[in-house]
Amino acid sequence: MAKTKRQIAEDLRLIDVVIEIRDARIPVSSQNPDMKELIKNKKQIIVLNKSDLADEKETLKWIKHFKDNGLSAISASSNSGKGINNVIKEIDKLMEEERKVSEQKGRVGKATRVLVIGIPNVGKSSFINRISKKTTMAVGNKPGVTKQKQWIRLSNNIELLDTPGVLWPKFESEEVALNLAFTGTIKDDILPKVEVAYRLLKFLLENYKNNVIERYKINKE
């Protein structure tokens, strides 16, 4: 992890905008706290990915929360493509003034360089495949599929730099660890499987009981 952090810190010197991919189901738990300090001086966009798997009402609340705190935030689904074009628009919006200054100085057509970060299994590679309209990157429901740094050029003068997903060495709370386990972000053998299953079912029954009953055709009687 230390090596990857050093590489990201070095790459940030070349970057205009940072896109942080988070899981819309766990928007706080899916942020690497070590990255927060690294990117604090850069323009940022939080993309709540996998929105098709999340509670839409809760996602909208989180989007409002981030915006109320001065952060750009967008709900998206790399699976369906919903919200992806809004990310491009937000990049253009954030870079509007800088582009005007560059044009005044004669640097017309200067590419906007964007760093895409995120912990494993939040859909980073799927997001880049969708936004670049390609399927050349390794994608899978397995933490840590992306291993090497990759530059991807988009048609609208934006260059994306992808980096491997990085988890932090110690989770600050049991809730964070459980949330990561619920969504398959950490390996199955890190936490006791029975405990994870019990806690997830308990959460679902307390918050989405009718959904569970409908999904598994449970007889209410």
Describe each PLM feature range.
Residues 1-17, 25-26, 31-34, 38-44, ...:
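Helix-rich effector regions associated with P-loop NTPase G domains
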Residues 20, 46-48, 116:
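Structural beta-sheet core signal
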Residues 22-25, 51, 131, 164:
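Anionic group-transfer/hydrolysis microenvironments
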Residues 23, 66, 127, 162-163:
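Residue-level signature of catalytic and energy-coupling elements of molecular machines
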Residues 38, 65, 69, 90-98, ...:
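Conserved, well-folded catalytic cores of nucleic-acid-processing
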Residues 42-52:
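Active-site cofactor/substrate anionic-group-binding motifs, chiefly glycine-
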Residues 51-118, 136:
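Canonical P-loop GTPase G-domain recognition
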Residues 113-133, 137, 163:
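Glycine-rich phosphate-binding P-loop
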